[in-house]
Amino acid sequence: MIEVTKPRAIALGYFDGVHLGHRALMQKAVERAKQIGGTSAVFTFDVHPDSVVMGRQVPLLTANAYRRDEIKLLGGVDEVIFGHFDERMQHMDWRDFIHKMLIGQFHAGWIISGRNNRFGYKGLGNAEGMAVECEKAGIGYDCIEDIKVYGIEVSSTYIRQLIAQGDMEGAAKFLGHPYTVTGIVEHGRRVGTSVLKVPTVNLRLPSEMALPPYGVYATRVLVDGKSYIAATNIGVKPTFVDGGAPTIEPHLLDFSGDLYGKMIHVELHKFLRPEMQFESVEALKNAIDENIRQTRDLFAEE
């Protein structure tokens, strides 16, 4: 257990997808924790604030079930603190958020936020106000400037736009890693194995996830500490199924075995073609063969 009496260097943000900007915040938290002899932490919320404030679901880059693990893995912080964002939190004065919550409840000895971070009721808290209040409290504060790629500010909103366009290469540049879908392998209808002779594993896409366009992608699948390239379909399989919830179905190349019940991570590297309804099973098989060839060629270049 982490000693709660130690001061924390706390990075603030929602940390959806853990992009390059998030990493800069967490790197500074790790650095400051060592400086103050404390622990590094992320403070985030259990739900996206806009889902409460605006009353609409925000498509996420990381499913809620896996956010803690991804933040710790990619950020290197000691702990992740999830605050419950409800109407009480929404109406909390920004000074109370700093003094009563971050300092009083979570023993912040240093706070790190981004230049555009807004917090407290109506988003009235900002970097300038944070600096003043931290100085009053006798704790440290760092404001991390925007991270830009090709002159464009790195943000979860912009990354969602790239994913919606199927630009996996662009999304990876802003994330600092491939866009990844994580889940537990389920039993499917076995169409890939029995009809197409191309066995696949089946994941149900979490409803809160940002969806890329339906189609076939060149992917890499990570499972049990090993990596396999795969041609992966995302969508509703219109050739065989009339409607239904979207699924993600990787066909792992050069792999044989049963992954049912295992957690896998599917990295989406490149959009190959849109999902479509084929006139025959043979036409679909030919398209899959071409997608497998494209996938092998892509990863052979690495």
Where are the regions a protein language model picked out?
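A short acidic, often aromatic-flanked loop/helix-cap motif at beta-alpha or helix-coil junctions
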Residues: 1, 87-90, 147-152
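N-terminal catalytic cores of NTP/NDP-binding nucleotidyl/phosphoryl-transfer enzymes
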Residues: 2-63
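Residue-level signal for inorganic ion chemistry
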Residues: 19, 71, 111, 171, ...
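A structural preference for short, hydrophobic beta-strand core positions in alpha/beta folds
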Residues: 42, 82, 143-144
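N-terminal Rossmann-like or analogous alpha/beta NTP/dinucleotide-binding catalytic cores
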Residues: 49-137
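Glycine-rich, Lys/Arg-enriched anion-binding loops that position phosphate/diphosphate groups
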Residues: 134-236
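Phosphate/ribose-recognition catalytic cores of enzymes acting on nucleotide-derived substrates
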Residues: 188-302
